[in-house]
């Protein structure tokens, strides 16, 4: 079982903690991680693109000239696709780009990225993370004490308003709950700060 240091929020070591090998100690599967990221990014697409076809463009109800005798090509509407200002043929319409991977694949992906963080020594397990008041300066001091200088994902066991509000103005820092941890967030942040209680929740779900 992988063993990592356990820290308190002052940045001091408070011992070690053994992580579940089936969650934090597997061989990362890069292909599955790639598929999971594609799925998440597809779900983030707005999909509100829209163009008008010939029936939706304003005007064009009258035949521009008679069928025969003018020497010009026959036309039925000035909103036909070949006209300037006409409708678009087979243009984009509003749609959802989201799709779902199988549950086992999604679980393997999140286990893979968590294991990668352990392998790269980019995971910091905290005994607890509590703030009495909303104070960005205090949160910044905690991160500095833990030598977190780049993008960091903070994972708490439950909703913690003081932590979330204190961290939201710090560039590159994101706070999520254990039940909302996802592949894209973990990959997009160099450091993973997770509380001991959150580790237990993640292991309970994924082990």
Swiss-Prot record:
<feature type="region of interest" description="Disordered">
    <location>
        <begin position="48"/>
        <end position="89"/>
    </location>
</feature>
<dbReference type="GO" id="GO:1990904">
    <property type="term" value="C:ribonucleoprotein complex"/>
</dbReference>
<dbReference type="GO" id="GO:0006412">
    <property type="term" value="P:translation"/>
</dbReference>
<keyword id="KW-0694">RNA-binding</keyword>
<dbReference type="InterPro" id="IPR002136">
    <property type="entry name" value="Ribosomal_uL4"/>
</dbReference>
<feature type="compositionally biased region" description="Basic residues">
    <location>
        <begin position="60"/>
        <end position="71"/>
    </location>
</feature>
<comment type="similarity">
    <text>Belongs to the universal ribosomal protein uL4 family.</text>
</comment>
<dbReference type="InterPro" id="IPR013005">
    <property type="entry name" value="Ribosomal_uL4-like"/>
</dbReference>
<comment type="subunit">
    <text>Part of the 50S ribosomal subunit.</text>
</comment>
<keyword id="KW-0687">Ribonucleoprotein</keyword>
<comment type="function">
    <text>One of the primary rRNA binding proteins, this protein initially binds near the 5'-end of the 23S rRNA. It is important during the early stages of 50S assembly. It makes multiple contacts with different domains of the 23S rRNA in the assembled 50S subunit and ribosome.</text>
</comment>
<keyword id="KW-0699">rRNA-binding</keyword>
<keyword id="KW-0689">Ribosomal protein</keyword>
<dbReference type="Pfam" id="PF00573">
    <property type="entry name" value="Ribosomal_L4"/>
</dbReference>
<protein>
    <recommendedName>
        <fullName>Large ribosomal subunit protein uL4</fullName>
    </recommendedName>
</protein>
<dbReference type="GO" id="GO:0019843">
    <property type="term" value="F:rRNA binding"/>
</dbReference>
<dbReference type="InterPro" id="IPR023574">
    <property type="entry name" value="Ribosomal_uL4_dom_sf"/>
</dbReference>
<comment type="function">
    <text>Forms part of the polypeptide exit tunnel.</text>
</comment>
<dbReference type="GO" id="GO:0005840">
    <property type="term" value="C:ribosome"/>
</dbReference>
<dbReference type="GO" id="GO:0003735">
    <property type="term" value="F:structural constituent of ribosome"/>
</dbReference>
